[in-house]
Regions:
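Active-site cavity-forming subdomains of large catalytic enzyme subunits
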Residues: 1-93, 97-108, 131-135, 188-190
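Short beta-alpha connecting loops at secondary-structure transitions
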Residues: 19, 73, 103-107, 135-139, ...
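Generic beta-strand/beta-sheet core signal
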Residues: 50-53, 69, 89-91, 151, ...
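Catalytic alpha/beta core of large soluble enzyme barrels
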Residues: 70, 76-77, 122-127, 197, ...
């Protein structure tokens, strides 16, 4: 995948390899393929891109002695070893603001409390979960991976009046995720003091990283698509922009006209809202 992304940056062709022999068997234009991937993902949600090389770097696979990551969780957000599974959960960022109007800002204190509670919740869920196979129970109990994600990021930007495709939005995303990662690790360290580190800790790369990484869970965060749970929480999905200001959602029995509440709020503030619109 790294070779493809470098080719895409250069807008050049990339090689196709025979999986059996490893020999080059053709080439394709990287930009044409990437544009097609983006178009089809927008139309129906597939395909996604799996970075096989990144899946097995030090951060993604802290237990290389136990094997390589060869699969993912159902939505592709989490690299996993053979037979492994992971408990996922997401924080609704749009509920972590303080102030009003132009004085609104991210409430990091509240976000920190939520992250600590969420890590404990996900570790509890790992403990109570049932497993269909012995191999799955052993590897999950051994690594205790959890995936704390986010949703409502686009909603957060709406309320802060920050354009989604701006450098300011990217900087805020980086600041938020760095904070979540830091607090998630702190919470996992607290759990390790109470309940012990994960069973495979001594086989992991974290063992030699010092006290900061003496944690309950081998891995902590993810970026899940949250397509379904964001509907339940009435917020924008994951880190994605909204699908549309207004659209028709169809189910097996009903059709729903959905209008983005933040657009409606601005329309009323600026006095251009109407039912006909």
């Amino acid at each position: 995948t790294t070779e493809f992304m470098h080719a895409l940056k250069r807008r050049s062709d990339y090689n196709l390899y025979d999986p059996r022999t490893g020999e080059v068997c053709g080439t394709l234009n990287s930009k044409r393929i990437f544009d097609l991937i983006g178009l089809m993902a927008w139309k129906n949600g597939d395909p996604g891109i799996v970075f096989l090389d990144r899946m097995n770097n030090e951060r993604s696979n802290p237990t290389p002695n136990l094997g390589v990551c060869e699969t993912t969780s159902p939505c592709g957000e989490y690299p996993l070893l053979a037979y492994e599974s992971v408990i996922l959960g997401s924080v609704n960022l749009s509920k972590h603001l303080k102030g009003e109007g132009s004085a609104r800002e991210v409430d990091f204190e509240k976000l920190g409390r939520t992250v600590h509670l969420a890590v404990r919740f996900l570790d509890d869920a790992t403990e109570l979960n049932g497993f269909p196979l012995r191999q799955t129970r052993e590897i999950v109990s051994g690594n205790r991976k959890i995936g704390l994600s986010i949703m409502g990021f686009a909603d957060l930007l709406f309320m802060l009046r920050i354009p989604y495709n701006s450098r300011k939005a990217l900087n805020l995303a980086e600041k938020i995720m760095e904070y979540i990662q830091t607090e998630a690790r702190a919470s996992s360290r607290e759990l390790a003091k109470e309940r012990g580190v994960f069973l495979n800790f001594d086989e992991s790369l974290l063992k030699d990283k010092g006290a900061e990484y003496k944690q309950r869970n081998a891995t902590l965060t993810a970026i899940s698509p949250t397509g379904t749970i964001s509907l339940v929480a009435s917020c924008s999905p994951s880190i994605e922009p909204i699908y549309g200001i207004s659209f028709l959602r169809k189910t097996a029995r009903f059709e729903f006209l959905e209008v983005n509440p933040y657009f409606e709020e601005v329309a009323k503030e600026q006095v251009f809202y109407s039912e006909e619109m």
